[in-house]
């Protein structure tokens, strides 16, 4: 599978700035971090600053990455009503995958279907790009694109 065996911890900044998604404990820490970002963003008055605070990036288009991106999107949708100052378009979840199809090990139809479902939920998917570096506020991709973000999840090996 594309990306299989890639050691994401060797990407500059990944170990320092990204949340790991492997255990239930990791999931609980991630949930708390997302809620914390929502709380903080609700106090920010400037739209662009709220958008940057609420930009979440998931790296990895396998089982864990797909599930994590969908769950983050669901969590945001479920709690947004408690935050009067956060508009629907301000929170974004971006899934970055080095291959051309999600869940490639399951075949073309299921991978494409999964991608359509995530996009319908509001998850933005970036295909055929690798993460080159992660900082506290950005993810830099192999094509030179920089994605502003406040939280990165490493949902791959």
What is the predicted role of each segment?
Residues 1-57, 75, 153:
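FAD-binding core/adjacent interface of flavoenzyme oxidoreductases
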Residues 14-15, 59, 120, 142:
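Alpha-helical hydrophobic/aromatic positions enriched in membrane-embedded helices and signal peptides
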Residues 59-62, 99:
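Glycine-rich Rossmann-fold phosphate-binding loop(s) that bind the pyrophosphate
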Residues 65-66:
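N-terminal Rossmann-fold NAD(P) dinucleotide-binding loop
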Residues 69:
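Glycine-rich loop/hinge motif
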Residues 73-157:
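A Rossmann-like FAD-binding core segment of flavoenzymes
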């Amino acid at each position: 599978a594309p990306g299989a065996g890639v050691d994401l911890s060797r990407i500059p900044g990944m170990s320092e700035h990204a949340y790991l998604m492997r255990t239930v404990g990791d999931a609980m820490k991630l949930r708390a971090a997302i809620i914390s970002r929502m709380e903080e963003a609700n106090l920010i008055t400037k739209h662009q600053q709220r958008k940057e605070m609420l930009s979440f990036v998931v790296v990895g288009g396998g089982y864990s990455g797909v599930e994590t991106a969908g769950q983050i999107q669901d969590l945001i949708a479920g709690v947004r009503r408690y935050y009067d100052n956060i508009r629907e378009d301000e929170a974004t979840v971006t899934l970055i995958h080095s291959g051309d199809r999600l869940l490639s090990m399951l075949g073309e139809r299921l991978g494409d279907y999964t991608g359509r479902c995530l996009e319908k939920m509001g998850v933005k998917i970036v295909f055929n790009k690798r993460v080159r570096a992660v900082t506290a506020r950005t993810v830099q991709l192999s094509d030179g694109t920089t994605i502003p973000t406040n939280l990165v999840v490493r949902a791959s090996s």
